[in-house]
UniProtKB/Swiss-Prot annotation:
SUPFAM superfamilies: ArfGap/RecO-like zinc finger. It comes from the Eukaryota. One of its GO terms (molecular function) is zinc ion binding. One of its GO terms (cellular component) is photoreceptor ribbon synapse. The gene is Arfgap3. GTPase-activating protein (GAP) for ADP ribosylation factor 1 (ARF1). Hydrolysis of ARF1-bound GTP may lead to dissociation of coatomer from Golgi-derived membranes to allow fusion with target membranes. GAP activity stimulated by phosphatidylinositol 4,5-bisphosphate (PIP2). One of its GO terms (biological process) is protein secretion. This is ADP-ribosylation factor GTPase-activating protein 3. InterPro entries: ARFGAP/RecO (IPR037278), ArfGAP_dom (IPR001164), ArfGAP_dom_sf (IPR038508). The modification Phosphoserine is found at S231, S241, S270, S274, S331, S377, S435, S458, S460, S462, S464, S465.
């Protein structure tokens, strides 16, 4: 037995997927499944096929219905005898309604269904061999191809048939041209007897008058491609009395006029009532004016000041433009502006520096007193020494805050500019070019220390500003000592000297004490 061809495989799966239950996934219900489980004969989506593949081929053998072309006849028979509906009913009959894939296909019901599908597929393969369809899955009847219809020909035929039907229909209410009724001929008499003329004097039956001009026909169902049944849209006119229509129109106009009059009456009544109220208010206000005996300017002022006792409805209110008076201020006093800077900037600078120096001197005086009080218990001489230092004039502290702290080379030398221009002309009259140092005499006042430093650094290949101005470079944190941290002020120098003297005296005192102890207890 050979393998089925690709056309046979496509034909079989096309037939199987046409079943409504096979158009969705057996496990999750996704549409258009393209994979199949041969072991159960069900259709699956690509996600559920991965879950079945993880179970193993001994539980579920997966193939693609579109990509795989090496199907065998036994595998195709498994799909034909199976199906999503058969598998679903079998699992429900055996009480397997779980959604878990592992639990579902490892259950007893799944094992029984696998054996059933295998048995039915083997029997179908032996019975039908290589036949494309089984008895239970017969080939679908081939329907003839739809015949192409000519749109214009069908439309024309429908119109012609409709016109013929309209002409064949008898008129419902027909009458003679003159409204006479004709009676059938009576053949009971002889052949010479003519038609009866008894109905000539009888008036014809008048047709019932219809209020509408055009008679509407009931809607009829349309057939074909929009063709209308009956005539080509023509509508029949009936006998209508135009005088009756005119009477109805006049009646409608009269009704509208009456409605307009009825609407206008309440408006007029409201206007009249409002006028009555206005006249009543005017009468009340007039009586109050007579009682208060107000007239002329007094009445206007009373109403403006709110003394109308609730009757101020004449439109008079407080006005900004009326009775406005301009009040002028007599002998205005101007505020004297405060001077932001009372003194010259240089004076303020020196005054601020003097204040700071006073505060700093006060700060430096306090530690001295504290130190003197602490050391007074050790030596009376030290106490007198600190008292002597604390009573000194705080001028050194004031001088320390000035410009004397800066190096002498960086300070601007104090010089006196040349008094008159005649001296400068006499001094520099024959010189082609001069500098500011020459003009102000700065070069002549160069300090001796600066010259000495320049001579000392003349042999150096490179110098720095710290070397030129004899400034100490910044030391590392490990090289700092108490002398570098404490400010270099005269008071601090005296403080250091006092500490050294006290320390020396303390050491002498300690040596004396130790010597006396050794002499007393050592021997």
């Amino acid at each position: 037995m050979g393998d089925p061809s690709k056309q046979d495989i496509l034909a079989i799966f096309k037939r199987l997927r046409s079943v409504p239950t096979n158009k969705v996934c057996f496990d999750c219900g996704a549409k258009n499944p393209s994979w199949a489980s041969i072991s159960y004969g069900v259709f699956l989506c690509i996600d559920c096929s991965g879950s079945h593949r993880s179970l193993g081929v001994h539980l579920s053998f997966i193939r693609s219905t579109e990509l795989d072309s090496n199907w065998s006849w036994f595998q195709l028979r498994c799909m034909q005898v199976g199906g999503n509906s058969n598998a679903s009913s079998f699992f429900h009959q055996h009480g397997c309604a779980t959604k878990d894939t592992n639990a579902k296909y490892n259950s007893r019901a799944a094992q029984l269904y696998r054996e059933k599908i295998k048995t039915l597929a083997t029997q179908a393969t032996r019975r039908h061999g290589t036949d494309l369809w089984l008895d239970s899955c017969a080939a679908p009847p081939v329907s003839p191809p739809p015949k192409e219809e000519d749109f214009f020909a069908s439309h024309a035929s429908l119109e012609v048939s409709g016109a013929m039907q309209a002409s064949a229909q008898p008129e419902s209410a027909s009458s003679t041209p003159w409204g006479l009724e004709t009676t059938p001929e009576k053949h009971e008499g002889g052949p010479g007897q003519g038609p009866s003329v008894e109905g000539l004097n009888t008036p014809g039956k008048a047709a019932p008058e219809v209020s509408s001009i055009i008679k509407k026909k009931p809607n009829q169902a349309k057939k074909g491609l929009g063709a209308k049944k009956g005539s080509l849209g023509a509508q029949k006119l009936t006998n209508t009395s135009f005088t009756e229509i005119e009477k109805q129109a006049q009646a409608v106009d009269k009704r509208k006029e009456q409605e307009d009059l009825a609407r206008g009456a309440p408006k007029e009544e409201s206007i009249v009532s409002s006028l009555r109220l206005a006249y009543k208010d005017l009468e009340i206000s007039r009586k109050k004016d007579e009682r208060l005996n107000l007239s002329g300017q007094k009445k206007v002022e009373a109403e403006r000041l709110g003394m109308g006792f609730g009757s101020c409805r004449s439109g008079i209110s407080h006005s900004v433009t009326s009775d406005m008076q301009t009040i002028e201020q007599e002998s205005p006093t101007l505020a004297k502006p405060r001077r932001k800077y009372q003194e010259d900037p240089e004076d303020s600078y020196f005054s601020s520096s003097s204040k700071w120096s006073e505060q700093s001197s006060r700060y430096f005086d306090d530690p001295m007193e504290l130190r003197s009080s602490s050391f007074s218990s050790w030596d009376d001489g030290a106490d007198s020494y600190w008292k002597k230092d604390s009573s000194r004039d705080p001028e050194p502290a004031m001088r320390s805050t000035g410009s004397s702290d800066r190096p002498s080379a960086r300070r601007k030398p104090e010089y006196e500019p040349i008094g008159s221009t005649d001296e400068a002309q006499k001094k520099f009259g024959n010189v082609k070019a001069i500098s500011s140092d020459m003009y102000f005499g700065i070069q002549a006042q160069t300090d001796f220390e600066t010259r000495a430093r320049l001579e000392r650094l003349s042999t150096s290949s490179s110098i720095s500003s710290a070397d030129l101005f004899d400034e100490q470079r910044k030391q590392t944190a490990g090289n700092y000592n108490l002398s570098n941290v404490l400010p270099n002020a005269p008071d601090m120098a005296q403080f250091k000297q006092g500490v050294r003297s006290v320390a020396g005296k303390l050491s002498v005192f300690a040596n004396g004490v130790m010597t006396s102890i050794q002499d007393r207890y050592g021997s």
